[in-house]
Amino acid sequence: MRLVESVPNFSEGRRLDVVERLANAVESVRGAFLLDRTMDASHNRSVLTIAGQAEPVTEALERAVAVAVHEIDMEVHWGEHPRIGSVDVIPFVPLGETTIDDCVEMARAFGRRIADRFEMPVYLYAAAATRPDRIKLSDVRRGQYEGLKAEIGSRGREPDFGPSRMHPSAGAVAVGARPFLIAYNINLASEDLELAKRIARRVRESGGGLPKVQANGFWIEELRRAQVSMNLLDYTVTPLWQVWETVQAEAAADGVELAESELIGLAPLASFLDVADHAGAPVDDPAESRLAAAAEFLKLRDFSPQQALELRLAAARRA
């Protein structure tokens, strides 16, 4: 049995009815469990977390792609988050005894499948990449939708599958295989966007900061706050508590406090327990108490214990 997680990102965060249709498409497949969904108006982006055996998960993904291709028009899309298509990115993540090589195989097969069905260009990234300059998602998304639309026919920008032209409304999609990624945002108690961008440059690995951390600064209109938005590519290398404390120190140097933080999607239970250990929570406390201690330390907004992947999947299987 090959268990897999996928976390497709869709370029729609303002129309609830469209996000509902995306979620319904996933839930229509027996054996595919929709564990989480988030919707962000400023980023104009929604994220679904799907887990289960490989076959139902890939079927659920294909049904969701069909909805996105029909409902989301990239010609009129705008938002804070970088993107290249209505379905911007589809990662396959190994769970249980599934290996990253298994996920590479799934990603490549699925990429070809949706390229053929929807006549949409597909770029393989991360462990599924077929060339070194496409390992990083940021390299695949260089120039975003508008830039790729202008360059897709040029040498070096041709897709792995599908036509060397953008789908007229859905754009392109990146499909890959990667280890578990934690999407983690910290909101500053400040409206200073430039400060958020400076902090992001200092904490991300490419700027000499924290290993396995990507970061950008954004303005979040509905909160009226500046945000440091991050991807933790390996929480065992740079844990959540270290990210929080590093951003806290950088902000404090400018006299700014941290308002709160948030997870986009789910995170492994071990990543929360690591924070609880750092916060001094007794190791023999119940898991729920240790999760609460971790959430308090990180000032996690709207936290639920069900944001721990293992707890959410167990609950979904019991339902």
Language-model features: locations:
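Long, contiguous binding/interaction regions
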Residues: 1-319
